[in-house]
């Protein structure tokens, strides 16, 4: 059930609560997608976490930021800290997926007093001016993993959308267009999207994902160019787990490995045969990795 919490300045945030364990904040990807697509993550971890799935500002019933620049990872992290304070939650676990994983890392660096543990799933944080080797590895990984789907029936329609994502999104006039675009490219996010069980889970994820076009436009309009977490990663003091799929075309080993190297004492769980959404592709493997880390 969706709930609303009041924030300073007449603003509000919408959220759901799933589970009965330690308090945790779950951060969705995008930026701009509602947190409901992470209900599966929360249910998998319901025995160890009481998860607060918070809609990002501007999504669901959460108030948009006054400045579109606040759709950055730091802007999201500061919004989530306001929500934590408004909910009177103590020190929390933060768990984020994709852009939400990048936000979770940012949150842990900026708010160490609020963060018990950090779990970043399929996160990115190595910017476009990264070490040439890391950048080259990421570009090669991206192209190779897209091309491996070339024989799938959806590929010919989806590949042009992926290749012109920024231009199409900036030209979109409503959130429904962004959601339709996302539905077309979502199969790329799985290592084996044509398996019936994976396809069914992906279809359900697409059904519940609601987009905030303003966040998408701000991101594709240039915010992403400033994302490089390396100056922050060394400041993360809490126990941290980096989870990545070895076949993730966006945030695979070329992102996960340098991120993990940059965080003192962090752990890296590289899930074989997985793409960008391990909670859908290998739910039990994902649950064991995260629950094992949190229960250590």
Positions of the model-derived regions?
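Catalytic active-site module of serine/aspartate enzymes centered on a nucleophile-bearing elbow/loop
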Residues: 265-296
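Conserved HGGG/HGGXW glycine-rich cap/lid loop of the alpha/beta-hydrolase fold
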Residues: 7-64, 69, 250
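Flexible "cap/lid" loop of the alpha/beta hydrolase fold
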Residues: 118-168
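Short beta-strand/loop motif that positions the catalytic acidic residue
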Residues: 236, 242-244
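Conserved alpha/beta-hydrolase "acid-adjacent" motif
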Residues: 249-255
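Active-site loop/oxyanion-hole signature of alpha/beta-hydrolase fold enzymes
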Residues: 56-99, 110, 288
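Conserved hydrolase catalytic core segment
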Residues: 90-137
């Amino acid at each position: 059930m969706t709930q609303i919490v009041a924030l300073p300045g007449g603003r509000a945030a919408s959220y759901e609560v799933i589970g009965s364990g330690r308090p945790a904040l779950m951060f969705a990807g995008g930026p701009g997608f509602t947190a409901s697509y992470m209900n599966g993550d929360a249910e998998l971890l319901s025995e160890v976490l009481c998860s607060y799935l918070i809609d990002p500002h501007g999504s669901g019933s959460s108030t948009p930021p006054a400045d579109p620049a606040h759709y950055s990872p730091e802007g999201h992290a500061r919004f989530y800290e306001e929500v934590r304070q408004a909910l009177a939650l103590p020190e929390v676990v933060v768990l984020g997926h994709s852009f939400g994983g990048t936000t979770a890392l940012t949150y842990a660096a900026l708010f160490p007093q609020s963060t018990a543990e950090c779990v970043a799933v399929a996160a990115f944080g190595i910017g476009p001016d990264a070490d040439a080797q890391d950048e080259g590895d990421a570009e090669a990984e991206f192209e190779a993993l897209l091309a491996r789907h070339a024989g799938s029936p959806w590929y010919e329609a989806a590949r042009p959308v992926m290749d012109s994502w920024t231009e199409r999104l900036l030209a979109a006039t409503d959130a429904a267009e962004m959601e339709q675009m996302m539905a077309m490219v979502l199969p790329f996010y799985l290592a084996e999207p044509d398996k019936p069980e994976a396809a069914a889970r992906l279809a359900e994820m697409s059904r519940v994902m609601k987009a905030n076009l303003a966040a998408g436009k701000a991101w594709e309009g240039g915010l992403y160019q400033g994302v490089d977490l390396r100056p922050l990663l060394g400041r993360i003091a809490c126990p941290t787990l980096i989870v990545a799929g070895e076949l993730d075309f966006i945030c695979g080993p070329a992102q996960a490995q340098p991120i993990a190297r940059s965080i003192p004492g962090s752990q890296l769980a590289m899930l074989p045969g997985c793409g960008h959404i391990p909670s859908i592709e290998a739910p039990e493997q994902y649950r064991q990795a995260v629950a094992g880390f949190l229960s250590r």
